[in-house]
Amino acid sequence: MKSLKFSLLAAVLLSVVFAFSSCGDDDDTGYLPPSQAIQDALKKLYPNATAIKWEQKGVYYVADCQADGREKEVWFDANATWLMTETELNSINNLPPAVLTAFMGSSYSNWVVDDVAILEYPNEPYTEFVVTVEQGKKIDLYFSEGGGLLHEKDVTNGDDTHWPRT
């Protein structure tokens, strides 16, 4: 009798373990790895890229990598067309002087700086510099290279991903 109870208990426990292990937290449902053409496009654009990790954001393929001494997110469409690169700057002191001066003169200069990045686009005549600040709210400030404030975006309760322009 003890043997039967033990066997039943073991069977129930094993069933529970297998049931929960099969319910993984897979956020990449439907993820398709990037094609060789997309991987080649990254190598052509950033030949020295290392620590490459691919993810899919919506319909885009994004390579998280290190290149030129900085952390980058390089965005491609399914046709291996480069759409955008976001480069982390790690500090407002890495901004161009005109952008730093504009930020320091803004009404957000006393807010906590959360993130600083450069957005580069293939078909744009300029680069955008994004300073993310927090103080009760979370705001992305987009500056031109000359220091002009292009626009601001409240990302307090929303998606703070910098998406490619379409």
Q: What are these model-derived regions, one by one?
A:
Residues 18-22:
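C-terminal motif of bacterial Sec signal peptides marking the signal peptidase cleavage site
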Residues 30-166:
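First exposed extracellular module after export/assembly in secreted or surface-exposed proteins
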